[in-house]
Amino acid sequence: MDQQRLTHLKQLEAESIHIIREVAAEFDNPVMMYSIGKDSSVMLHLARKAFYPGKIPFPLLHVDTDWKFREMIEFRDRTAEKYGFELLVHKNPEGIAMGCSPFVHGSSKHTDIMKTQGLKQALNKYGFDAAFGGARRDEEKSRAKERVYSFRDKNHTWDPKNQRPELWKTYNGQVNKGESIRVFPLSNWTELDIWQYIYLENIEIVPLYLADKRPVVERDGMLIMVDDDRMELQPGEVIEEKSVRFRTLGCYPLTGAIESEANTLTGIIEEMLVATSSERQGRAIDHDQSGSMELKKRQGYF
């Protein structure tokens, strides 16, 4: 395929499909992480394209923290039923038993128990030797220096100082028993690329990405949506109805919305063209050193 004849987005699409097919051919037991967000929706769309008209030859895995937005879970189940892929859902049973909550245990401990430890449990349980993730290099500085094929040892840890060289499109997938590779087919995409591709390919997304009137409270400089009756208000907090949307989606008490009137994909793209801040600015788990992304990734987080 002559890359020079392809548009920018078609070049990114071709690169991602090549990576997805390469992993499917090279590894014995791959899995695709499905976080239900916009990047996961694009990655799922690319996987469906990569193997069309056949089915996706590997399962999708959602590590459920029990604190995702209700609209996310509804969208997940509806999407799995619509496309007929194998969906695995894992919750950390120890975390559920202890009632792990971002309100009681804090963002760092909640993320470690329900996301990092939950992910490692699922990878061990099913014996996956490769796991696709939707992370992009433009999101955050530790992700910017990570390889497309990111090696993990038998404890699922990452050493950023000991990464394998990647020359052009030659990826090293050699692993010993118990080791694995995290694979990031969207590494070279930007947030704007994602939204333009969603628009052009008519990809379904969680409605929370589009602006609407929603109940929110202002906390630590973020607008937190009140998604269910588990939301614990702090003294002086008042629930307000505001027109907001989300640039990134995670556990609802730890994910900040932005005030916006962009209720269409074209409106979102117009906002992205003038945006000067990272989408992960709305993630509470990224705001303190103890919860930094690189530290979490070293411990096994995606």
Swiss-Prot record:
GO MF annotation list: ATP binding; sulfate adenylyltransferase (ATP) activity
Enzyme Commission number, as recorded: 2.7.7.4
Gene name of the record: cysD
Keywords: ATP-binding, Nucleotide-binding, Nucleotidyltransferase, Transferase
Protein's UniProt name: Sulfate adenylyltransferase subunit 2
UniProt catalytic activity: sulfate + ATP + H(+) = adenosine 5'-phosphosulfate + diphosphate
UniProt similarity note: Belongs to the PAPS reductase family. CysD subfamily.
Job of this protein: With CysN forms the ATP sulfurylase (ATPS) that catalyzes the adenylation of sulfate producing adenosine 5'-phosphosulfate (APS) and diphosphate, the first enzymatic step in sulfur assimilation pathway. APS synthesis involves the formation of a high-energy phosphoric-sulfuric acid anhydride bond driven by GTP hydrolysis by CysN coupled to ATP hydrolysis by CysD.
